[in-house]
Amino acid sequence: MAHKKAGGSTRNGRDSESKRLGVKRFGGEAVLAGSIIVRQRGTKFHAGINVGCGKDHTLFALADGKVKFEVKGPKNRKFISIEAE
């Protein structure tokens, strides 16, 4: 005869893997063409001059230069540009 009642099962205990989103190159940093600047969900940051936007909204450098963050427009949107050297 068992001396302990059987333990119940739980439906918790799992979590999704982190997606490593965020800014990868900060303002003033030198980058090469093709370098990833930001990984994001949606357009928290918008592509400015010399910056491309991938299908998953990843921003990347189209030219060598320095990263520049700026807030522009009537809606105060955040843009990332590359100032060519």
From Swiss-Prot:
<dbReference type="Pfam" id="PF01016">
    <property type="entry name" value="Ribosomal_L27"/>
</dbReference>
<dbReference type="GO" id="GO:0003735">
    <property type="term" value="F:structural constituent of ribosome"/>
</dbReference>
<dbReference type="InterPro" id="IPR001684">
    <property type="entry name" value="Ribosomal_bL27"/>
</dbReference>
<feature type="region of interest" description="Disordered">
    <location>
        <begin position="1"/>
        <end position="20"/>
    </location>
</feature>
<comment type="similarity">
    <text>Belongs to the bacterial ribosomal protein bL27 family.</text>
</comment>
<keyword id="KW-0689">Ribosomal protein</keyword>
<dbReference type="GO" id="GO:0022625">
    <property type="term" value="C:cytosolic large ribosomal subunit"/>
</dbReference>
<dbReference type="InterPro" id="IPR018261">
    <property type="entry name" value="Ribosomal_bL27_CS"/>
</dbReference>
<keyword id="KW-0687">Ribonucleoprotein</keyword>
<dbReference type="GO" id="GO:0006412">
    <property type="term" value="P:translation"/>
</dbReference>
<protein>
    <recommendedName>
        <fullName>Large ribosomal subunit protein bL27</fullName>
    </recommendedName>
</protein>
